[in-house]
């Protein structure tokens, strides 16, 4: 793999093929796990999204607190946890509730994702 492709990942200077592979593989795993969890239909889809996002926020906080190498943060934090959590789904679910004139649900979806996401990231930082 040429250096221009590796540098496009913008991990750290001199990122290796293994780093790029792990990043892409774990990003795919994170997105697949999120998709599977949301399709279990245990709750309304917005509730699943809240759970996945606060879980990911906690793990990102915990990871950052462990102070690993920047490449590890990129691979695990951005690759896996970034694709496990989802901002775009929150926005699409919120837009759908606005379209359906369920404004209270819109506020709840946005509020829970933001407030609980920040709270659980903080808890992860404190426990890490």
Language-model features, listed with the residues they occupy:
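Membrane-interface helix-loop junctions in multi-pass transporters/channels
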Residues: 2-128
């Amino acid at each position: 793999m040429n250096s221009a492709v590796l540098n496009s990942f913008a991990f750290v200077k001199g990122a290796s093929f293994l780093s790029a592979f792990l990043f892409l593989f774990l990003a795919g795993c994170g997105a697949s796990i999120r998709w599977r969890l949301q399709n279990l239909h245990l709750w309304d889809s917005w509730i699943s999204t809240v759970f996945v996002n606060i879980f990911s926020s906690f793990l990102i906080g915990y990871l950052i607190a462990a102070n690993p190498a920047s490449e590890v943060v990129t691979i695990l934090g951005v690759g896996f946890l970034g694709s496990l959590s989802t901002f775009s789904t929150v926005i699409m679910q919120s837009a759908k509730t606005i379209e359906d004139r369920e404004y209270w649900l819109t506020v709840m979806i946005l509020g829970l994702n933001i407030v609980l996401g920040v709270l659980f990231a903080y808890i992860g930082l404190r426990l890490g």
